[in-house]
Amino acid sequence: MRYISGHVKKGRKTYYYVKDTQTGSFEKSCTKYLKHKILQNRSLNTVNRIAYTLPYYMNFLSERELTMMDVANMKFTDQSEHFYDFLMYVKNGIHTGTYREVKNNTANSYLQAVFGLYNFLHRCGELPYLNVLDDRNFSYVSPVGTNVSSTYTAYDGYLRSNEHQSRVATKEDIELILSACQNNRDRLLISLMEETG
């Protein structure tokens, strides 16, 4: 792997970076984006997840001998194919070298982090806007009668989301859980959840 992520502490803040192992230097665009996320007071878990994801994309670009500017300047169909290829790269586990398939939701979240980087670089004036991203408006009337509208960015090429596999707890399951409870508060909370469904 050519690109890796890491972190350093400066006082009470933790800063994340993406490093090129061939040159030993920081990957400036990714590191600048991660610093921006820290300065926006995003949670450390969020920034850590993004820092964990970006090297996979940078390695993907490196293997294809592309730069982010090359991708941003592609035509719509080429960009669509590029990001679909990245989704498959992650989905099939090629990004880690284990070739173990990951869930669609995981692959989609990795691509969302990449789009966040492209959006940040566009706002900084370093890259043009991606052709595959679509700005959409959403509006509704609030309960007090005012019109509320917002704009969001959409991408139509995400993989289908995985359905959550859940099962209903039986009476025996609940009794088993209640018998394992150490205190009355937990018993009460579980009983209330059972009553309310």
What are these regions, as identified by a protein language model?
Residues 30-45, 54-146, 176:
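N-terminal core-binding DNA-recognition domain of tyrosine recombinases/integrases
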Residues 50, 101, 196-197:
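Short glycine-rich, low-complexity/disordered patches
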Residues 1-42, 48-55, 59:
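Basic/aromatic DNA-contact patch characteristic of tyrosine site-specific recombinases
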Residues 132-140, 188-197:
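Short flexible/disordered coil segments
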Residues 127-171:
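Flexible interdomain linker/hinge and immediately adjacent N-terminus
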Residues 49, 112-116, 188-191:
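Short amphipathic alpha-helical face segments that pack within enzyme cores
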Residues 167-196:
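Basic, Lys/Arg- and aromatic-enriched nucleic-acid-binding interface segment
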